[in-house]
Curated annotation (Swiss-Prot):
It is linked to Erythrocytosis, familial, 3: An autosomal dominant disorder characterized by elevated serum hemoglobin and hematocrit, and normal serum erythropoietin levels. Residues 120-129 have a biased composition (Low complexity). Fe cation binds at residues 313, 315, 374. Its cofactor is Fe(2+); L-ascorbate. This is Egl nine homolog 1.
Length: 426
């Protein structure tokens, strides 16, 4: 087993953007398959779990897990590696990458920042649209791109429920809520917001931000419900695809719980989910080539404010069906200069990144696949967010077939009881 060596002439930024764990999507402290030298893993356990799938495309594979992985560094090509014996010989680094870029002053505004030494003049080309109060909606400058979801085996589960009841199509999303165009007092209908802002922003940039989504009162009620869940001990450690590998807490430091929206004390969270569904329903058929026919339950997440975050990763690296990530933030008076906690998105193939501050009543959409690697930078104050993932019908169906035929690296679980983590909504 040969390790990748450092040196000049290393991979380009676009090549680095395509290097991630084939199983969980993690993008740091990678190990390279020493046989084909084109696939990467964050640990040997994930390599073993992915072998049944990977051996079909691994050059020189012999039908068994006979190849190993070596530590990957981004700064140079490695010499050709000899085919290792069936027993892997390289030790996995036990220290997971926890490095984050420090949040700068302007990084808290939801605008694009250039990665040094990119030209700052090329960084900002915001897409603005209706929002409530004095707020505005900003989409980052990025090609159609694609979390926070956890790469979590129990996230997906077959269900056949209808979308939750929601407001009349075209109506405002909440009685006293936002979605008002700048300078206007009349709420912007969900249909107009979806078709005139979200659809074009997503198709052009792959990232879309809507501020003052539901209004101060509704946002406060959602925050109260989330804090009540936290105070009553409903949150547990965020999970990875596999808990067999070490340092999972170094990879993600959040506490989470899963909500359907019908639980006692979660009625306003249910309203939020219905409002998200309204927007997606209006967008459906117009977001790329996706046909959205379901979603997960809501993942309510809390970073406790002790400097934890979530390292750079991809929500859906393996075609599990998730196509759109939708995140709602609950953090009043958030100051990223003091509290950090920025969601930084690295759109594939772009010299810029997008910094999204987790501001109160802010809604964020982005593609869930490999086009949008992202990280949550260390948070030094309690940071709350609610995330829902929407499924593409065709990719979801293919993922289920892969699971049923033994390609379990897709991590789709079927036929779970109704109180399990994930849920399809049709």
């Amino acid at each position: 087993m040969a390790n990748d060596s450092g040196g000049p002439g290393g991979p380009s930024p676009s090549e680095r953007d395509r290097q991630y764990c084939e199983l969980c999507g993690k993008m740091e402290n990678l190990l390279r398959c020493s046989r084909c030298r084109s696939s990467f893993y964050c640990c040997k356990e994930h390599q073993r779990q992915d072998w049944k799938k990977h051996k079909l495309v691994c050059q020189g594979s012999e039908g068994a897990l006979g190849h190993g992985v070596g530590p990957h560094q981004h700064s140079g090509p490695a010499p050709p590696a000899a085919v290792p014996p069936p027993r892997a010989g390289a030790r996995e680094p036990r220290k997971a990458a926890a490095r984050r870029d420090n949040a700068s002053g302007d990084a808290a505004k939801g605008k694009v920042k250039a990665k040094p030494p990119a030209d700052p003049a090329a960084a900002a080309s915001p897409c603005r649209a209706a929002a409530g109060g004095q707020g505005s909606a900003v989409a980052a400058e990025a090609e159609p791109g694609k979390e926070e979801p956890p790469a979590r085996s129990s996230l997906f589960q077959e269900k056949a429920n209808l979308y939750p009841p929601s407001n009349t199509p075209g109506d405002a999303l909440s009685p006293g809520g936002g979605l008002r165009p700048n300078g206007q007092t009349k709420p912007l209908p969900a249909l107009k917001l979806a078709l005139e802002y979200i659809v074009p922003c997503m198709n052009k940039h792959g990232i879309c931000v809507v501020d003052d989504f539901l209004g101060k009162e509704t946002g406060q009620q959602i925050g109260d419900e989330v804090r009540a869940l936290h105070d009553t001990g409903k949150f547990t450690d965020g999970q990875l695809v596999s808990q067999k590998s070490d340092s999972s807490k170094d990879i993600r430091g959040d506490k989470i719980t899963w909500i359907e929206g019908k639980e006692p004390g979660c009625e306003t969270i249910g309203l939020l989910m219905s409002s998200m569904d309204d927007l997606i329903r209006h967008c459906n058929g117009k977001l790329g080539s996706y046909k959205i026919n379901g979603r997960t339950k809501a993942m309510v997440a809390c970073y406790p404010g002790n400097g934890t975050g979530y390292v750079r990763h991809v929500d859906n690296p393996n075609g599990d069906g998730r196509c759109v990530t939708c995140i709602y933030y609950l953090n009043k008076d958030w100051d990223a200069k003091v509290s950090g906690g920025i969601l930084r998105i690295f759109p594939e193939g772009k010299a810029q990144f997008a910094d999204i501050e987790p501001k109160f009543d802010r809604l964020l959409f982005f593609w869930s696949d490999r086009r949008n690697p992202h990280e949550v930078q260390p948070a030094y104050a309690t940071r709350y967010a609610i995330t829902v993932w929407y499924f593409d019908a065709d990719e979801r169906a293919r993922a289920k077939v892969k699971y049923l035929t033994g390609e379990k690296g897709v991590r789709v679980e079927l036929n779970k009881p109704s109180d399990s983590v994930g849920k399809d909504v049709f």
